[in-house]
Amino acid sequence: MEEYKALLDEKMGRVVLSLESEYKSLRTGRVNSALFDKVFVDYYGEKTPLTRVANISVPEARLIVIQPWDRSLLSKIEQAILNSDLSMNPSSDGSVLRIKVPVLTIERRKEIVKQAKKIAEDHKIATRNIRHELNNKAKKQEKDSQITEDDLRRILDDIQRDTNFYIKKIDGIFDLKAKEIMEV
């Protein structure tokens, strides 16, 4: 029974970490350099994360400064940002890119909350798939007479209880993110 608990905690813990990681790249009321985690630059024929070819800083609440380590990449970085789904317009002064980030409109905030909700739902589905996988494993063990019917019932109840815990955790993370996004 402990093997199920450990396996469930490991797999569902990874789902929660994945959700938190995806939420870092969503734009909120606050400017965050993690917005650029999914921006890739063509660096000598390789798609390279922007964070590996430039320093990204947030000197002011609504300003992002991107300083490439190799100045020849400035135009490629600018193009990568323009081609991304961030809806940002960088301005170049020859050595750094500056991006003035406008305040999000209510409509845009609502769109981002919908996007966050979909991400949370996808992670809840992943959690339920893990539950399904572990339930099947336990049922197979009972069928093969490795565990008793009472043990099976206990294991299934434990798996369901832990699944409910992780689903509530995902809902809580979503609620916090939605509140953060809607903050003006």
Swiss-Prot record:
GO terms for biological process: translational termination. It holds the Pfam family RRF. Its main location: cytoplasm. InterPro entries: Ribosome_recyc_fac, Ribosome_recyc_fac_dom, RRF_sf. Keywords: Cytoplasm, Protein biosynthesis. One of its GO terms (cellular component) is cytoplasm. GO terms for molecular function: ribosomal large subunit binding. It is found in: Cytoplasm. PANTHER family: MITOCHONDRIAL RIBOSOME RECYCLING FACTOR PSEUDO 1, RIBOSOME RECYCLING FACTOR. HAMAP family: RRF (MF_00040). Responsible for the release of ribosomes from messenger RNA at the termination of protein biosynthesis. May increase the efficiency of translation by recycling ribosomes from one round of translation to another. Belongs to the RRF family. This is Ribosome-recycling factor. It comes from Borrelia duttonii (strain Ly).
